Amino acid sequence: MESLTLQPIARVDGTVNLPGSKSVSNRALLLAALARGTTVLTNLLDSDDVRHMLNALSALGVHYVLSSDRTRCEVTGTGGPLQAGSALELFLGNAGTAMRPLAAALCLGSNDIVLTGEPRMKERPIGHLVDALRQGGAQIDYLEQENYPPLRLRGGFTGGDVEVDGSVSSQFLTALLMASPLAPQDTVIAIKGELVSRPYIDITLHLMKTFGVEVENQAYQRFIVRGNQQYQSPGDYLVEGDASSASYFLAAGAIKGGTVKVTGIGRNSVQGDIRFADVLEKMGATVTWGEDYIACTRGELNAIDMDMNHIPDAAMTIATAALFARGTTTLRNIYNWRVKETDRLFAMATELRKVGAEVEEGEDYIRITPPLTLQFAEIGTYNDHRMAMCFSLVALSDTPVTILDPKCTAKTFPDYFGQLARISTLA
């Protein structure tokens, strides 16, 4: 297996221009495809997950022109539901941001489409979304295991009253919201259980509004979406930088700055993961905000005990930043780590112990006490981009670290290690 050994980093300082947000890129691509008119997306993320969405749209007959660096995309909208000419199978890798929204969008009209993906995708639950779509009339079959992809979709979603469980993934609600305006009837979506990762719903609502569709949001408990609508292209849309990707550089600044500035997001960002910077501030770092940047300067870091449900992806970065904080850090209410690219609670606990931390892994929390000195380790990445990026922070100590399968960062950030090296001074 390929590996990358990072030598100890004495200091980080500089500016990182963030690649486009994965969450925003894939939502914007789908809405642009469904909309009337042509949309030019700029700062689109070039990564595996976005390529899976682009390939699927292409197979569905959507016409787009992609620039040579794949960050500008001109999409010719279809002005309504996506219709496949014939029976089709779409392979979506391990891209939840393609699988879930497409599963809903392709239940509009009359298609015969199979959605499948990598082995791990077949372990990521989708039953709550399927249940909700079926309540709205969709014809969906599980081809292998009940409640998991691959799925066969044969249209039929007409709207009406649907209830969706919000406790596992906000992507199920996102998928329903984006498809519902194109259903023939109004859709009333009721949330069952606690809605996790709520800020991701705000991204969805913001993008729908950008494409001309407003949703009545009743305190995140009920959402009313008028049917028979059409998305309208906004013309041009700039995809903001990826706030989850920003977390590694901001944390590096907190641990070994200097000052690290990330551009492409700022105080008015639509992504909830910018709140990650508040957590670093709480731990003792200095954070400054601009319209188009966030900067983080080193501070004496202290442990925290916090509910991280609002920023599950960025919270992983706090788990490795905790290695550099005084005291025991507890991250709570993160059960949904278990249903991501890998079981992230198990993976994080296992790898943190390798570098010498004392770790308690709960069903939905993790408690981390750092060692006096970090130990050298080979870090398994579980084909999970965030594991690779999180554990690169170990090099901000006096100890090198080896990352196995470093190319798994291609899911969201192909040039991550290059960007980290650019702002690093080796010990």
Curated annotation (Swiss-Prot):
> What is the native source organism of this protein?
Klebsiella pneumoniae
Q: Which GO terms describe its molecular function?
A: 3-phosphoshikimate 1-carboxyvinyltransferase activity
Q: Which cysteines are joined by disulfide bonds?
A: none
Q: Which Gene3D superfamilies match?
A: Enolpyruvate transferase domain
Function noted in UniProt: Target of the herbicide glyphosate. Catalyzes the transfer of the enolpyruvyl moiety of phosphoenolpyruvate (PEP) to the 5-hydroxyl of shikimate-3-phosphate (S3P) to produce enolpyruvyl shikimate-3-phosphate and inorganic phosphate.
Recorded hits in PROSITE patterns, A to Z, give: EPSP_SYNTHASE_1 (PS00104), EPSP_SYNTHASE_2 (PS00885)
Catalytic site positions: D313 (proton acceptor)
- Name one matching Pfam family: EPSP_synthase
Gene name?
aroA
Residues recorded as binding phosphoenolpyruvate, renumbered to this chain, are: K22, G96, R124, Q171, R344, R386, K411
Please report the name of this protein according to its UniProt entry.
3-phosphoshikimate 1-carboxyvinyltransferase
Q: Which reaction does it catalyse?
A: 3-phosphoshikimate + phosphoenolpyruvate = 5-O-(1-carboxyvinyl)-3-phosphoshikimate + phosphate
Q: Where in the cell is it found?
A: Cytoplasm
